[in-house]
Amino acid sequence: MHGLIPDKLPRHLAIIMDGNGRWAQERMLTRIIGHQKGVETVRIIVEECSRLGIGYLTLFAFSAENWLRPKTEVKALMALLKKYIASEAARMDANNIRFNVIGNRDELPPDVNKAVQGAIDRTSGNTGMILTLALSYGARQEIMTAATRIASDIASGVLKADDLSETAFASYLFTSGLPDPDFLIRTSGEMRISNFLLWQLAYTEFYFSSVNWPEFTPEELYRALSDYQARERRFGRTSAQINTRS
């Protein structure tokens, strides 16, 4: 038993899945084997989050900066991504999971984009957890894209500068329609957010696990969620104010 309190689970959980290469290196295996093992962990954690009743799960799968990795590794990652999405679409559909992608999809290979769109279309009517993969994603690029679109809309009269608010700005981001993450987990012991959801993480609780992603089990997930449930989220208020409101 995990001992978690259902009513205190994060509505939106985000995970930076780090440590595939490190896990492989420790075992004298190739990096791609580490990524393959990481995909198995994705499958397990996605289904566990859905079972727990978490409404939104966002996974940082491939950053805008990851294109700078060796071409052989990038090619292998794209092939693995295509295979995962194509093979998991039916499983997601059966589990009532809705699939979503954020990032610059135009930079993805056509066959990967085809698999992505197929999974999005197949699961579009589902009402359970929304699984979002961040692919070719960078938060600074996201913010710049939003700012450019806003400037264009103001110039064309679609938007008035005086009407620009935080809510209006957020509607121009890739994550439009998604709530901000309540909880962010990063694996492998690294303590940084690596250009991930810079706007959206303003009041998110962070948790850094020393476990590499391929070894991130449901038990490790429960440990992280238990830590989250023990925290007091204040959103700039005092403890007294929070207790009075509750």
Curated annotation (Swiss-Prot):
It comes from the Bacteria. Its cofactor is Mg(2+). SUPFAM superfamilies: Undecaprenyl diphosphate synthase. InterPro entries: UPP_synth-like, UPP_synth-like_CS, UPP_synth-like_sf. The keyword Metal-binding applies. Binds 2 magnesium ions per subunit. GO terms for cellular component: cytosol. Substrate binds at residues 19-23, 31, 35, 63-65, 67, 69, 186, 192-194. Disulfide bonds: none annotated. Keywords: Magnesium, Metal-binding, Transferase. GO terms for molecular function: ditrans,polycis-undecaprenyl-diphosphate synthase [(2E,6E)-farnesyl-diphosphate specific] activity; magnesium ion binding. Its EC number is 2.5.1.-. Catalyzes the condensation of isopentenyl diphosphate (IPP) with allylic pyrophosphates generating different type of terpenoids. Belongs to the UPP synthase family. Homodimer. This is Isoprenyl transferase. It comes from Geobacter sulfurreducens (strain ATCC 51573 / DSM 12127 / PCA).
